[in-house]
UniProtKB/Swiss-Prot annotation:
GO BP field: phenylalanyl-tRNA aminoacylation
The protein's name in its UniProt record: Phenylalanine--tRNA ligase alpha subunit
Needed co-factor(s): Mg(2+)
Binding site for Mg(2+): 254
The entry's keywords: Aminoacyl-tRNA synthetase, ATP-binding, Cytoplasm, Ligase, Magnesium, Metal-binding, Nucleotide-binding, Protein biosynthesis
Assembly information from the UniProt record: Tetramer of two alpha and two beta subunits.
NCBIfam families, per database record: pheS
GO molecular function, a single term: tRNA binding
Xref: InterPro entries: aa-tRNA-synth_II, aa-tRNA-synth_II/BPL/LPL, Phe-tRNA-synth_IIc_asu, Phe-tRNA_ligase_II_N, Phe_tRNA_ligase_alpha1_bac, Phenylalanyl-tRNA_Synthase, tRNA-bd_arm
Length: 339
């Protein structure tokens, strides 16, 4: 029996030395140590031995078993290390090859234009004020001299959350909140997103950016309004730009006007963008209506003011010659990389 165990041990050693893969090692393990393995069969047959032989043979059998198990374990480790070395050799990185360049993002034209507009007004002494995008009807309409059932409400398709809450249709509510919380003199701008229930096309979007401005103090006149906006236009579009004011109507200003600027595409010569007129509508403006001042507890007999409002998206389109507002919101890198 001892001789048989030595033969099994030597046979296993020779086979292990010749093995080249984990699969071959597994075959050897099953052959000698599996449930029907050669060594396992000998251990099961020890019951037929005499009491004197049993402990001697059992000791030798266990030693052979331990030796084969340890040898298989070492062989597994050696093969694993060889495979790792081969894999690392095949995966060697050539550090002399050029690396993959990281894409550098660019600022959105809306952001660039907003920053330019804010910088111009800040240099003129304006402060920046903010307000909620979900707004009370009171601030979005009533305090702006647009009571319930006023025809001006029909001009703006509004997203109503309930009877008293809306998604703001303009940043004018920030002007009301500022006049309620600050005493004149007031000189502020209110940039931000606004919402209107418009169908999406080349010139309309349900979400867009607006910037409104307000000045309230003693002795403010329409001349102050014109001077401020003409200076803004020259700083924004260059000294050659010309402006003109046309009478208009807004419920929150009186008198009201719209300011046009010479077309930035044809420089006032006439083209399809300006429809041959040489002029492009730039903004709405006017003197703050006395009732709006009263709604904010400001005495219109003592104070006067002017207000104005831009569509920032429109400014971007005019400044960069963009003919479709949807391009500003589609995240198309081919478009955005131009700026």
């Amino acid at each position: 029996m001892r001789q048989k165990l030595e033969e099994i041990k030597n046979s296993a050693i020779n086979e292990l030395k010749a093995s080249l893969s984990k699969d071959q090692l597994e075959v050897i393990r099953v052959k000698y140590l599996g449930k029907k393995g050669e060594l396992t069969q000998i251990l099961r047959g020890m019951g037929a031995l005499s009491q004197e032989e049993r402990p001697i043979v059992g000791k030798v059998a266990n030693e052979v078993r331990s030796y084969i198990e340890e040898t298989i374990k070492e062989a597994f480790s050696d093969i694993k290390n060889k495979e790792k070395s081969i894999r690392l050799e095949n995966e060697t990185i050539d550090i002399t090859m050029p690396g993959k360049k990281q894409e550098v993002g660019k600022r959105h034209p809306l952001d660039l234009t907003l920053e330019s507009m804010k910088d111009i007004f800040i240099s003129m002494g304006f402060t920046i004020e903010e307000g909620p995008e979900v707004e009370l009807d009171k601030y979005n309409f009533e305090a702006l001299n647009i009571p319930k059932n006023h025809p001006a409400r029909g001009e703006q398709d509004t997203f109503y959350i309930n009877d008293n809450l809306v998604l703001r249709t303009q940043t004018s509510p920030i002007q009301i909140r500022t006049m309620e919380n600050q005493k004149p003199p007031i000189k502020m701008i209110a940039p931000g997103k606004v919402y209107r229930s418009d169908s999406v096309d080349a010139t309309h979007s349900p979400i867009f950016y607006q910037m409104e401005g307000l000045v309230v103090d003693k002795g403010i006149t329409f001349s102050d309004l014109k001077g401020t906006l003409e200076l803004f236009a020259k700083r924004m579009f260059g000294d050659k730009v010309k402006t003109k004011f046309r009478p208009h109507h807004f419920p929150f200003t009186e008198p009201s006007a719209e300011m046009d600027a010479t077309c930035f595409v044809c420089n006032g010569e006439g083209c399809k963008v300006c429809k041959g007129s040489g002029w492009i509508e730039l903004l709405g403006c006017g003197m703050v209506h006395p009732q709006v001042l009263r709604n904010c507890n400001i005495d219109p007999e003592v104070y006067s003011g002017f207000a104005f409002g831009f569509g920032v998206d429109r400014m971007v389109m005019m400044k960069y010659g963009i003919d479709d507002i949807r391009l500003l919101y589609e995240s198309d890198m081919r478009f955005l990389n131009q700026f």
